[in-house]
Regions:
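Zymogen propeptides
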Residues: 21-119, 137-138, 187
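Bacterial N-terminal signal peptides
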Residues: 10-20
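General beta-strand structural signal in soluble alpha/beta enzymes
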Residues: 93-97, 130, 215-219
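Bacterial N-terminal signal peptides that target proteins for export
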Residues: 1-12
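Active-site-adjacent helix-turn-beta-strand microarchitecture at beta-sheet edges
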Residues: 100-168
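Conserved, well-ordered active-site substructure
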Residues: 103-122, 168-180, 184-218, 224-255
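Conserved hydrophobic/aromatic beta-strand scaffold that supports enzyme active sites
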Residues: 56-60, 127, 177, 247
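Extracytoplasmic
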Residues: 54-56, 88-89, 123, 154, ...
Length: 255
C-alpha cells in the first residue's frame, strides 16, 4: 500500500535485494528481531532488476508461544479497518485477511477458534489452516471438515507451493500474504509489487535475502492491504483504502 514506503523510512535496518531471473541474488539475509514473546519482525526493500522496487514488513509468529486469531469486523458495518478490528487487543500485530464480495462479506472459508465465520468454501483457492499449533497452506478442496481446525482463512493465488514459485498472472498491487510451516506463520505486507517478483522474494532462501517460505498464500491486497502493530518496542499503523471483513491478529504471550 502507498503508506508503507514512507512508514519504513524511520526504521533503521533495510534489506536490499537485487538479482536476475529465477536465480535472484539477495544482498543481505533478513534481520528479524524479537519484538514480543513469540513475535519477530523484519523490514525489507527489494529491488528486482526487471521491475519496480517494493518494501514492507514481515512478522514471524511462533504458535508455540503467541496466539493467532481470525477476528471479524464488529459493529453495524460488516467491514472495519484493521486498526478498528485490533482495537480490543492491548498488544497485537494485525493484517487484513479475507477477500470480500460487493456486500462486504468474507469470501471463502473463515474459521476462528473452531467457530465458522464464513461458509463459502472455494475449492480451487488456497487456505491457511491452523490445527493446534501446527499451520499449513492447502487447497480448499483438501479441507473435508472445517470443524477439526482451529483457524482457517482462504486466499488466492497460492504464491509458493513446496518451495516453488507458481506461474502467476502479472499484476502490480499492494500485497498482503501469509507463509506457513509447522509452528511458524509469517505475515507479510508490501508496497506495490509485481506478483512473481513478490513470490520470488517470499521463496528466496534466507541466506540470500529471501524469507524462505516453503508455502505462501496471497490474501486480499490493493487498498485492502493494511497493518497494525501495537507492541511495547514497536508501533506501526499502516492504513489501507477501506474497511475489511476480518483480520489475522497475532497476540504475544504474556510475560
Amino acid at each position: 500500500m502507498r503508506y508503507l514506503k514512507a512508514a519504513a523510512l524511520y526504521l533503521s535496518a533495510l534489506l536490499v535485494v537485487s538479482g536476475a531471473g529465477l536465480s535472484s541474488v539477495w544482498a543481505q539475509p533478513p534481520r528479524f528481531s524479537v519484538v514480543a514473546p513469540g513475535i519477530a519482525h523484519a523490514i525489507f526493500e527489494v529491488r528486482p532488476p526487471d521491475g519496480e522496487p517494493f518494501s514492507g514488513h514481515a512478522f514471524k509468529i511462533d504458535l508455540d508461544v503467541a496466539e493467532l486469531r481470525l477476528v471479524s469486523a464488529a459493529g453495524p458495518s460488516s467491514k472495519q479497518t484493521v486498526e478498528q478490528i485490533a482495537a480490543p487487543f492491548p498488544a497485537a500485530v494485525a493484517v487484513n485477511a479475507s477477500f470480500f464480495d460487493n456486500e462486504g462479506r468474507a469470501m471463502g472459508l473463515a474459521v476462528d477458534e473452531g467457530r465458522l465465520m464464513a461458509s463459502g468454501k472455494r475449492h480451487s483457492w488456497g487456505a491457511l489452516v491452523v490445527s493446534g499449533t501446527n499451520a499449513r497452506i492447502v487447497l480448499g478442496s483438501d479441507i473435508p471438515d472445517h470443524r477439526v481446525h482451529r483457524l482457517i482463512v482462504q486466499g488466492v493465488p497460492r504464491l509458493v507451493v513446496g518451495g516453488k514459485v507458481q506461474r502467476l498472472k502479472p499484476q502490480l498491487a499492494e500485497r498482503t500474504a501469509v507463509c506457513a510451516g509447522g509452528s511458524i506463520v509469517t505475515l507479510v505486507v508490501s508496497t506495490k509489487a509485481e506478483t512473481t517478483a513478490f513470490a520470488r522474494f517470499l521463496a528466496g532462501p534466507p541466506e540470500t535475502g529471501g524469507l524462505g517460505c516453503v508455502d505462501a498464500l496471497n490474501l486480499d491486497g490493493g487498498p485492502s492491504t493494511q497493518l497494525v502493530a501495537k507492541l511495547s518496542v514497536l508501533t506501526l499503523s499502516l492504513p489501507g483504502g477501506w474497511g475489511v471483513p476480518n483480520a489475522l491478529v497475532a497476540i504475544p504471550a504474556k510475560r
